[in-house]
C-alpha cells in the first residue's frame, strides 16, 4: 500500500492553496465544502475566487508565493501551472511537516486527492495512487450509480436512531438484523428524500414494532428491452440487494451478470429444454419466498406493467399482505424502436401510439376498426405467431396494403435483427424472424433508412 487513505477534519482549520486558475478553483471548492478556513495565494485569480472573497468565504493574497503563509496551516495544495513554484510550495510545506498536494505531480506531493463520492455523512474515496486518474474517475462513476443520492439522508437519520436501537435490541445480532432492514427499506429512503416527516415516523415505528424475522418483500423490477445499459439505476440497486431473483427468458445474460453473486436465482421462463412455469406457480414462488423473510426481486424484461402480467402477480401478494414495490423499466416498444431508427411518433405521420398484445385470452378479439385508423403507430407484443392474422385483419378493416411494417428480433442487443416491408408481406416476413420479436406497423417505419444508427456501430 503506497498511500494510507484517511479522512481529514478541516473545519475551521487554516489551509493554503497556491494558484488562482481553474484547477485551483476546483480544489478550493472541495476545501470550502469541508469547512476549511482557506487562504489562496496567486499572481492572478479567475473571477470565482473574487466572488468567494467578497462573500467572506476565503482570503486572497495577490502576489508571488509567500511561504510564511504556511506557518499556521494544517494542509496545502500547489496548483499553479509553474512546476518550479509548485516544487517550492512542496519543499516549504515539507520543512514545516505540513501535508502538501501537488497537482499532477504525485511524486512531489505528501498526499494525493482521490475521486470522491459525497453522500455526507457517507463518503467514498477512490484512488489509483496517481498512476491512472482516468481509471479512478471511471470507477467513481460506476460507484455513483450504485449509491442513491438520498443515501446520506438515510445515514444521517440512522445516526439519530442509534441510541434507541441500542436500548431496544439487546444483542449485536438483533441490532444487525434491524439495521439490515432499515437500510434496504425503500419507503423510508423515499420519505426522507421527500422530507415527509409523517411518513418517516410511521415507517420508523413499523420497523421498530415488527418482529426481526418478519415476512420479506417483493420488488417487481423491469429489466428493460435487452441492452444492460438500459437497466435503470434503481433496478440495478434492487437486483444487487436481492436475496432471490425470479426471472424470465427476456432478461438478458448481461443483466443477470449484474445480480448479487450470492443471491439465489429461479428461472421461470420458456427456453429450449425448459417448460414454461404456469403463472399461478410463479405467483406462489414469490409468495412462498417472501414469507420466508427474503427480499425477492421479480425481474421481467421490458416494463413489468406493460404486457408483463405484473399486476396479476402483485394482486396475489396484496391478498396475502406481503409488502411490494415496483421499479419501472424501458418497455420493448420504446427500446426496440429507438435502436431500429423508428420514431414511434412524428408530426407528419403518427400522432398516437398503440401498444397491442398479439396474445389474447381464449375468445378475445382486438378492436381492429380502430387499429386500422390513419396517423398512428401500432406496436404488437407477442404477435409473431399471429402475424398473418394481423395482416389479414388490418387490411380487411381498411388499412392500406402498402403500410410499412418492421419486425425487430432481439431488440437493443448485439443480436438485433430488423426485417421490414409492407403490410401485405407481414405474414411472410414473420417466417424469417424468431422470438423474441416485436412488430411495428405505421408510416414511421419508412424513416428507418435515414434514422437507423444502431447498425452502424
Curated annotation (Swiss-Prot):
Q: Name one GO biological process term.
A: methylation
Gene3D superfamilies documented for this protein = Cobalt-precorrin-4 Transmethylase, Domain 1 (3.40.1010.10), Methyltransferase, Cobalt-precorrin-4 Transmethylase, Domain 2 (3.30.950.10), NAD(P)-binding Rossmann-like Domain (3.40.50.720), Sirohaem synthase, dimerisation domain (1.10.8.210), Siroheme synthase, domain 2 (3.30.160.110)
Name the positions where NAD(+) binds.
22-23, 43-44
Instruction: Give the protein's function.
Output: Then it catalyzes the NAD-dependent ring dehydrogenation of precorrin-2 to yield sirohydrochlorin. Finally, it catalyzes the ferrochelation of sirohydrochlorin to yield siroheme.
**Which positions are tagged coiled coil?**
none
> Which keywords annotate this record?
Cobalamin biosynthesis, Lyase, Methyltransferase, Multifunctional enzyme, NAD, Oxidoreductase, Phosphoprotein, Porphyrin biosynthesis, S-adenosyl-L-methionine, Transferase
Q: Report the active site residues.
A: 248 (proton acceptor), 270 (proton donor)
Q: Tell me the residue numbers annotated for binding S-adenosyl-L-methionine.
A: 225, 301-303, 306, 331-332, 382, 411
Residue ranges for the region (Uroporphyrinogen-III C-methyltransferase) are 216-457
Record protein name field: Siroheme synthase
Where in this protein does the record say Phosphoserine is found?
128
Chain segments carrying region Precorrin-2 dehydrogenase /sirohydrochlorin ferrochelatase: 1-204
Annotated Gene Ontology MF terms? NAD binding; precorrin-2 dehydrogenase activity; sirohydrochlorin ferrochelatase activity; uroporphyrin-III C-methyltransferase activity
Q: In which pathway does it act?
A: Cofactor biosynthesis; adenosylcobalamin biosynthesis; precorrin-2 from uroporphyrinogen III: step 1/1; Cofactor biosynthesis; adenosylcobalamin biosynthesis; sirohydrochlorin from precorrin-2: step 1/1; Porphyrin-containing compound metabolism; siroheme biosynthesis; precorrin-2 from uroporphyrinogen III: step 1/1; Porphyrin-containing compound metabolism; siroheme biosynthesis; siroheme from sirohydrochlorin: step 1/1
Give its E.C. classification number: 2.1.1.107, 1.3.1.76, 4.99.1.4
Amino acid at each position: 500500500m503506497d498511500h494510507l487513505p484517511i479522512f481529514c477534519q478541516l473545519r475551521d482549520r487554516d489551509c493554503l492553496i497556491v494558484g488562482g486558475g481553474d484547477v485551483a478553483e476546483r480544489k478550493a471548492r472541495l476545501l470550502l465544502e469541508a469547512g476549511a478556513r482557506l487562504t489562496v495565494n496567486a499572481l492572478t485569480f479567475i473571477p470565482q475566487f473574487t466572488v468567494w472573497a467578497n462573500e467572506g468565504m476565503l482570503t486572497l493574497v495577490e502576489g508571488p508565493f509567500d511561504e510564511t503563509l504556511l506557518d499556521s496551516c494544517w494542509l496545502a495544495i500547489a496548483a499553479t501551472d509553474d512546476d518550479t513554484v509548485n516544487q517550492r510550495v512542496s519543499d516549504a510545506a515539507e520543512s514545516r511537516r505540513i501535508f502538501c498536494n501537488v497537482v499532477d505531480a504525485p511524486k512531489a506531493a505528501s498526499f494525493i486527492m482521490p475521486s470522491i463520492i459525497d453522500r455526507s455523512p457517507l463518503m467514498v474515496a477512490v484512488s489509483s495512487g496517481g498512476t491512472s486518474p482516468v481509471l479512478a474517475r471511471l470507477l467513481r462513476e460506476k460507484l455513483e450509480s450504485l449509491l442513491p443520492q438520498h443515501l446520506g439522508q438515510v445515514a444521517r437519520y440512522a445516526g439519530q436512531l442509534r441510541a434507541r436501537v441500542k436500548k431496544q435490541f439487546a444483542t449485536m445480532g438483533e441490532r444487525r438484523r434491524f439495521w439490515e432492514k432499515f437500510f434496504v427499506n425503500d419507503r423510508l429512503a423515499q420519505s426522507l428524500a421527500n422530507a415527509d416527516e409523517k411518513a418517516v415516523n410511521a415507517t420508523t415505528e413499523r420497523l421498530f414494532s415488527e418482529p426481526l424475522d418478519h415476512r420479506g418483500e417483493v420488488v417487481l423490477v423491469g429489466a428493460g428491452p435487452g441492452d444492460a445499459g438500459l437497466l435503470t439505476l434503481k433496478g440495478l440497486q434492487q437486483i444487487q440487494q436481492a436475496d432471490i431473483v425470479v426471472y424470465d427468458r427476456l432478461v438478458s445474460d448481461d443483466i443477470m451478470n449484474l445480480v448479487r453473486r450470492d443471491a439465489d436465482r429461479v428461472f421461470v421462463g420458456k427456453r429450449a429444454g425448459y417448460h414454461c412455469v404456469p403463472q399461478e406457480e410463479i405467483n406462489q414462488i414469490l409468495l412462498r419466498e417472501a414469507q420466508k423473510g427474503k427480499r425477492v426481486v421479480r425481474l421481467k424484461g421490458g416494463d413489468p406493467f406493460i404486457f408483463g402480467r405484473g399486476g396479476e402477480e402483485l394482486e396475489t401478494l396484496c391478498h396475502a399482505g406481503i409488502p411490494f414495490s415496483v421499479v419501472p423499466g424501458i418497455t420493448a416498444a420504446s427500446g426496440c424502436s429507438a435502436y431500429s431508427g423508428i420514431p414511434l411518433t412524428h408530426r407528419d405521420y403518427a400522432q398516437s401510439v398503440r401498444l397491442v398484445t398479439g396474445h389474447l385470452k381464449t375468445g378475445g378479439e382486438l378492436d381492429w376498426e380502430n387499429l386500422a385508423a390513419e396517423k398512428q403507430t401500432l406496436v404488437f407484443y407477442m404477435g409473431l405467431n399471429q402475424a398473418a392474422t394481423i395482416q389479414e385483419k388490418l387490411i380487411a378493416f381498411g388499412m392500406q396494403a402498402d403500410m410499412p411494417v418492421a419486425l425487430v428480433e432481439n431488440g437493443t442487443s448485439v443480436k438485433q435483427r430488423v426485417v421490414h416491408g409492407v403490410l401485405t408481406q407481414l405474414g411472410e416476413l414473420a417466417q424469417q424472424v424468431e422470438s423474441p420479436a416485436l412488430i411495428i406497423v405505421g408510416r414511421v417505419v419508412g424513416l428507418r433508412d435515414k434514422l437507423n444508427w444502431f447498425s452502424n456501430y
